[in-house]
Amino acid sequence: MTEFFMGLGLSYEWAWGISTIAGILLIALPLMLGVAMIIYADRKIWAAMALRRGPNVVGPLGLLQSFADGLKVFLQETIIPTAANKGLFLIAPIITFTVALMAWAVIPFNSGAVLANINVGLLYVLAISSLGVYGVVIAGWSSNSKYPFFSAMRASAQMISYEVSIGFILICVVLWAGTFNLNDIVKAQQSHVWIINGFVANPLLFPMWVMFLISGMAETARAPFDLTEAESELVAGYQTEYSSMAFALYWLGEYANVLLMCALNAVLFWGGYLPPLDIPVLYLVPGFVWLLLKILFFFFIFSWVKATVPRYRYDQLMRLGWKVFLPVSLLFVFLVSGYLMATGHFA
């Protein structure tokens, strides 16, 4: 895109700046539209599981319900508790929302179609996604209320606990692919096992995908790991004191993170923008379509689990992360490393 603007007579600096802004808009605007649609889909799936109809009034089939909700919160007043730290209280949801968007910069939507094709893309995702907990912790502390504070403590412990096992899982992927570049990781999955595109067909990496999927639910605080928003215990958790657009930013950030986790499942284990099978006719379908279908598939799994699995207790959540996922993921790091060294394919 930079070359295109340079061809119009612009200097490199101007062309790079305009192309970067255009790339950000090309990702951010469809992402926000996608978030609105998956909120609608989430409510529809949850309703279907409970034998209800779900949103069905605003627009055809209720498709405009999310936009109506957005307009409603936009017109509401932002109420700040008198005892709250005003500056931190308002900046916390902005941090969560901004961090959720920044992580998408390195997701490859097709071969070469990525905003920032950096060599440490996976490390970038880990670093940026780790910053999301600051928005939650700041909200819990600045609200000066016991329910948000308890929620913030839970959120920090939960996210840190599962980031450790996620790190070991991603080490297995990096060892096999030999790179931190997400685009190269996708290419390394082509015909990985026979004609199957994806590390998920690998017996050593399939358990890692299952653990990554579950850890992703815990990392994004989705049910059954939504201990930070346990209504029966913490009202609405760290969001209890929020209203209007500040509350909406948390919702947008939460669902953007869920979509990001679905995209990472697709990119790291299911071949990303590659078709499921390495068959020439399947490559006629554009790569971004395959990636979108995989993201929707994983989002359905997230919603399905949310509607069917009861919430974990806090001690069960910690036990699963530290006593099950951590040792198992560490064991598989040794297994994958040993296999690659024994077969002479160590990257």
From Swiss-Prot:
Record GO biological process: aerobic respiration
Example GO molecular function: NADH dehydrogenase activity
Major place of residence: membrane
Membrane-crossing segments per the record: 21-41, 87-107, 120-140, 160-180, 194-214, 259-279, 282-302, 324-344
Protein topology in the membrane: Multi-pass membrane protein
Pfam families xrefs: NADHdh
Top-level taxon of the source organism: Bacteria
Subunit structure: NDH-1 is composed of 14 different subunits. Subunits NuoA, H, J, K, L, M, N constitute the membrane sector of the complex.
Family: Belongs to the complex I subunit 1 family.
HAMAP family attached to this UniProt entry: NDH1_NuoH (MF_01350)
Stated name of the protein: NADH-quinone oxidoreductase subunit H
Organism, as annotated: Novosphingobium aromaticivorans (strain ATCC 700278 / DSM 12444 / CCUG 56034 / CIP 105152 / NBRC 16084 / F199)
Gene name of this polypeptide: nuoH
